[in-house]
Amino acid sequence: MNIAELYGKMGKHSWRIMDAIFKNLWDYEYVPLQLISSHARIGEEKARNILKYLSDLRVVQNRQKDYEGSTFTFIGLSLYSLHRLVRSGKVDAIGKLMGEGKESAVFNCYSEKFGECVVKFHKVGHTSFKKVKEKRDYGDLHFSVLAIRSARNEFRALQKLQGLAVPKVYAWEGNAVLMELIDAKELYRVRVENPDEVLDMILEEVAKFYHRGIVHGDLSQYNVLVSEEGIWIIDFPQSVEVGEEGWREILERDVRNIITYFSRTYRTEKDINSAIDRILQE
């Protein structure tokens, strides 16, 4: 998606309509037109026309069944979250798409306050959020709320881990997390010359995370970055706090995954149980 081009097509009334949708996502799967009109302080007919325009741009999805209502698409939620970052003075220019997967889309951007950085737009929520049973008058919890909670989860985890081998995190709005741009490559893309040392560095960070009360939750070769300067661990939407239900099993899985990768790729010999015990005892 060309989010910069799309951003330029939004006017003040479009943002007011999107404000109204955002504020009511927690109460409605599709926010009723009457409520959007009221919150945006725009007449219903004009609001309907703006929503049609936004739908044509794939920013919102409208429906007529049962009642007339609208909700965000992933692009729309990301666009609106970017707008909140711009409005708060955190982002001044958005760049190109750097990468996109099932869980997020990452763009480079520029901030006068923070310099060159990246903004990560979350697509889906934390696994546990998918089991939310909240019911509302107009349907179930919308995926947008799950994406927002996923972004919030990552932001809060990174805040607790600042100063360790993680990106500096600057802001969170909607489904967007603004963070430091790290010039490094994913572990699976490179051939490291000192695998035992790199593995030890990763496990040391896992131990530091644990002592700050955080378990990554999805540690693998895909979210470890390496360069000549060291290693960084990224992607924390599935992180859990130490003490949450199942945290120990999640920690053990993280350790097992990364040790198994090094064993298969570099024939390293690291005992998984001993590594886990060391993390818990340090």
Swiss-Prot record:
It is an enzyme of class 2 (transferase). One of its GO terms (molecular function) is ATP binding. It holds the Pfam family RIO1. It comes from Archaeoglobus fulgidus (strain ATCC 49558 / DSM 4304 / JCM 9628 / NBRC 100126 / VC-16). It catalyses: L-seryl-[protein] + ATP = O-phospho-L-seryl-[protein] + ADP + H(+); L-threonyl-[protein] + ATP = O-phospho-L-threonyl-[protein] + ADP + H(+). Monomer. Its cofactor is Mg(2+); Mn(2+). Autophosphorylated. Keywords: ATP-binding, Kinase, Magnesium, Metal-binding, Nucleotide-binding, Phosphoprotein, Serine/threonine-protein kinase, Transferase. The active site is at D218 (proton acceptor). Mg(2+). Mn(2+) is seen in the crystal structure; there are 2 Mn(2+) ions in the ATP-bound crystal and 1 Mn(2+) in the ADP-bound crystal. One of its GO terms (cellular component) is preribosome, small subunit precursor. Mg(2+) 2 binds at N223, D235. Belongs to the protein kinase superfamily. RIO-type Ser/Thr kinase family. GO terms for biological process: maturation of SSU-rRNA. This is RIO-type serine/threonine-protein kinase Rio2. Its EC number is 2.7.11.1. Mg(2+) 1 binds at E103, D235. The modification Phosphoserine is found at S128. Residues 92-282 form the Protein kinase domain. The keyword ATP-binding applies. ATP binds at residues 98-106, 120, 126, 180-186, 222-223, 235. InterPro entries: Kinase-like_dom_sf, RIO2_wHTH_N, RIO_dom, RIO_kinase, Tyr_kinase_AS, WH-like_DNA-bd_sf, WH_DNA-bd_sf.
